[in-house]
Amino acid sequence: MSNKEQLIEMQGKVDEVLPDSRFRVVLENGHTLIAYSGGKMRKHRIRVLAGDTVSLEMSPYDLTKGRITFRHLEPRAGGAPRRPSPHRR
């Protein structure tokens, strides 16, 4: 996946969390593929759970693998607001 112009961007839902930080994702069109977290998501420790809606990039040469680039936030159904994460120094 070296050339950005050739990447295919899709959205899907995480169906299952697999070992080694991989995920089984079902795309909007019904196809299932294996995806991994992108580098910035690992760097900033963005956690992806089963049921999350994600954006991912795929190579046109191998449509069975993808890279998760964004986790979409679902609106919360009432309750308490989100707590800010504790700051570490």
UniProtKB/Swiss-Prot annotation:
Keywords annotated in UniProt: Cytoplasm, Initiation factor, Protein biosynthesis, RNA-binding, rRNA-binding
Compartment annotation: Cytoplasm
Example GO molecular function: rRNA binding
Pfam families associated with the record: eIF-1a (PF01176)
A GO cellular component entry from the record: cytosol
Domain of life: Bacteria
Complexes and interactors: Component of the 30S ribosomal translation pre-initiation complex which assembles on the 30S ribosome in the order IF-2 and IF-3, IF-1 and N-formylmethionyl-tRNA(fMet); mRNA recruitment can occur at any time during PIC assembly.
Role of this protein: One of the essential components for the initiation of protein synthesis. Stabilizes the binding of IF-2 and IF-3 on the 30S subunit to which N-formylmethionyl-tRNA(fMet) subsequently binds. Helps modulate mRNA selection, yielding the 30S pre-initiation complex (PIC). Upon addition of the 50S ribosomal subunit IF-1, IF-2 and IF-3 are released leaving the mature 70S translation initiation complex.
Protein's UniProt name: Translation initiation factor IF-1 1
Record organism: Acidovorax sp. (strain JS42)
